[in-house]
């Protein structure tokens, strides 16, 4: 795992700090894969995700429902910055209802999964995937009644998440990660699952680069 703040680190730290007892919810994209790979689920009904349906914006509404049904449980929605834009207005609902859900934004300033495909399979012809437009998710979240922090290091995330666990109202953590972070393994377009490949396989096809 790379040094510094990354999607896998965030998910593993959430698992550690919740002792595996959280209800995890996801949006759609790279963060969804990391949430599936790096949180060690051992109990039923603790991962709420729309699977392969591609429903960006699903997670926050699902987290509101999960928190309403389980007021004494820790509910964490894992979102990308692209997904957060789809349904972030529902933070106002969570604030009005005083729901202590935790919204963790894995913010790489791109539509990460689509951009990864463009990198690996379309010669880095990036189209409609860059979101680096300066939107301040902390201020947006605060405007809708949530507590919010931006974090750029592992230490900052750990402190922010500890504070989020103690909060009685919605808490948003905007985690800044590298735009080129990738999720592995991958399956190329039109290929079967038994031809999936990881980063080492991919680098071998690129001459080790």
Label the predicted regions:
Residues 154, 162-209:
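Glycine/aspartate-rich loop-and-adjacent alpha/beta segment that forms the canonical ThDP
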Residues 1-66:
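Active-site diphosphate/adenylate-binding microenvironment
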Residues 32-33, 54-56, 84-85, 109-113, ...:
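Short gly/pro/ser/thr-enriched loop/turn and capping motifs at secondary-structure boundaries
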Residues 50-53, 123-132, 199, 203-206:
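A short acidic, glycine-rich active-site loop
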Residues 19-22, 42-45, 70-75, 88, ...:
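Short coil/turn connectors at secondary-structure junctions
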Residues 69-160:
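Conserved thiamine diphosphate
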């Amino acid at each position: 795992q790379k040094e510094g703040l990354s999607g896998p680190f965030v998910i593993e730290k959430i698992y550690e700090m919740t002792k595996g007892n959280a209800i995890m919810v996801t949006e759609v994209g790279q963060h969804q894969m990391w949430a599936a790979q790096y949180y060690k689920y051992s109990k039923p009904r603790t991962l709420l995700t729309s699977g392969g349906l591609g429903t960006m914006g699903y997670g926050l509404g699902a987290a509101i429902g999960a928190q309403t049904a389980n007021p004494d449980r820790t509910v964490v929605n894992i979102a990308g910055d692209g997904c957060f834009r789809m349904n972030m207005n529902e933070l106002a609902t969570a604030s009005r209802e005083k729901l202590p859900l935790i919204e963790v934004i894995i913010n790489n300033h791109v539509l990460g999964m689509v951009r990864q495909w463009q990198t690996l399979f379309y010669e880095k012809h990036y189209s409609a995937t860059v979101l680096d437009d300066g939107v301040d998710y902390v201020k947006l979240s605060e405007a809708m009644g949530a507590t919010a922090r931006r974090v750029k290091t592992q230490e900052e995330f750990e402190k922010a998440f500890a504070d989020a666990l103690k909060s009685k109202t919605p808490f948003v953590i905007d985690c800044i990660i590298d735009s080129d972070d990738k999720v592995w393994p991958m399956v190329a377009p039109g290929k079967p699952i038994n031809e999936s490949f990881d980063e080492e396989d991919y680098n071998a096809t690129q001459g080790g680069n």
